[in-house]
Each structure stands twice: as structure tokens, then as C-alpha cells.
A protein has these predicted regions:
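A general structural signal for short secondary-structure boundary/capping elements
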Residues: 101-106, 173, 195-202, 219-224
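Short linear elements at protein peripheries
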Residues: 207-228
């Protein structure tokens, strides 16, 4: 027995076809509105490591592990953060990622990668509950007391991250890491369209992160160590 799929039939009248096309266009516009808002929210506060203002904290978002090591995208983010530290544009690196399972620890893998590239261990602070971008931004502000930070992520994500952190109360500047326009990049860009809708709701309603917890003094202690 052959399965017949339903066919999409356009209206026969010219007016009906015009309304159908207008409806599709309206849906496309609505789908793009959150992503457009994210870019406008970031404004001119996104650039390269050379453009980034000097400050105290650089914040790196997790981007997955392969066999316990940072994925290439995460490694590139960490390379940019290490460059900001070496050039004196940051005194402390806040690594924020997922450690919801014992066998999966993004922050510790990020810390190891940075120390292997010359960033002192006492200048690295770990947030083990950065389960998504909004959680990372809110926790940086409320748990770690970060008021101003340079954020590092890929170009397709950095506008959303910057807008969310600004909505969370952080004076944020985003550094976008360039990547080849391969399948992974296009997948990330497409994923951003879906993630932007969720992010717009988060910025509007400002929910608590999945895990808030008590305040931590890691960033303040690392900055004090840097000033000695």
C-alpha cells in the first residue's frame, strides 16, 4: 500500500494567492524580528579583540566538549580570551558552562585549556551552572558580581550574548570570533534564529536561571590577586 502525502493547494483566485503569499511573508518577518532585535540590542558594542576596550573581566561561554577537550569552536573562543589577557585587556577570565553531569565538565576543561596557554590558574574563575546564555549572564551579575565584561563567542552568537548580558545588567562588549563558512557555521546561524525568540522572552520577563545559589567571591578574589 502506497502512502500518499497531502498536497499543498494554493488558492485558485488571484486574491487568494496574494493573501497566501502575504501570509507567508508575514510569518517570515515575525520569525526574523527577535534576531533583528538582538542585533539592534547589541548595537555597536561588538567587534574584534583589537577593538575590545580594556577592562577587568573577559567572559567565555561554553560550546561543547569532545572527549573531555574543548570543541574547535570553544577552543577558538578560549584563544581569543587568552589573547585579551596577554594584551592586558582583561585581568580575569570567567569561564561559564555546563557541569550538570559528573562526566561532563565544560568549565574545568576550559580552565585547563587556558592554563596550557599561559593564563595563570588564579586568574580563572569557573561558573559550573552556565547552562545557557541567559543563565550565564544572570549568574555573572548576581552570583559573581560582574558589572562590566568583554564577552567572547562566535560571530553568529555574540549579538545575542551581548544583548542578554546587557539586559541582565552587565555593561557588556562582545568579541566575535570568525569561523569558516562551513556546515557547522550555517547550522549555528540557523540555530540562532530559533534561539533569538527564546532570548527575547528572557530579556523581556527576566526569569531566574536554572540554578541561582549563593553569591561567590571568585571574581573579586582573582582581581585582588591581579592587583598585588
Amino acid at each position: 500500500m502506497r502512502l500518499r502525502l497531502p498536497t499543498l493547494r494554493l488558492p485558485r483566485s488571484r486574491r487568494g494567492r496574494r493573501l497566501a503569499v502575504q501570509g507567508v511573508m508575514a510569518l517570515c518577518v515575525l520569525a526574523l524580528l527577535p534576531a533583528t532585535w538582538m542585533r539592534l540590542g547589541a548595537g555597536d558594542r561588538v567587534g574584534t579583540t583589537a577593538d575590545a576596550p580594556a577592562g577587568e573581566v573577559v567572559m567565555v561561554f561554553g560550546a561543547g566538549l569532545w572527549n573531555g577537550r574543548p570543541t574547535p569552536y570553544l577552543a577558538h573562543r578560549l584563544d581569543a580570551a587568552a589573547e585579551l589577557y596577554r594584551t592586558g585587556k582583561a585581568k580575569v577570565v570567567l569561564v561559564t558552562g555546563d557541569n550538570s553531569r559528573v562526566e561532563y565538565d565544560e568549565p574545568d576543561a576550559m580552565r585547563t585549556y587556558l592554563t596550557e596557554r599561559g593564563v595563570p590558574d588564579d586568574r580563572i574563575v569557573s561558573d559550573y551552572a552556565g547552562f545557557d546564555s541567559w543563565d550565564s549572564c544572570v549568574r555573572a551579575k548576581k552570583i559573581f558580581g560582574v558589572d562590566r565584561a568583554v564577552l567572547v563567542s562566535q560571530g553568529f552568537h555574540i549579538h545575542r550574548a551581548t544583548t542578554l548580558c546587557r539586559s541582565a545588567g552587565i555593561d557588556a562588549y562582545g568579541v566575535g570570533v570568525d569561523e569558516p563558512r562551513d556546515a557547522t557555521w550555517y547550522y549555528g546561524g540557523a540555530r540562532e534564529l530559533a534561539a533569538s525568540g527564546k532570548a527575547a522572552l528572557e530579556a523581556l520577563f527576566r526569569p531566574d536561571p536554572h540554578f541561582l545559589g549563593p553569591q561567590e567571591g571568585g571574581v573579586a578574589e582573582a582581581l585582588a590577586s591581579a592587583s598585588r
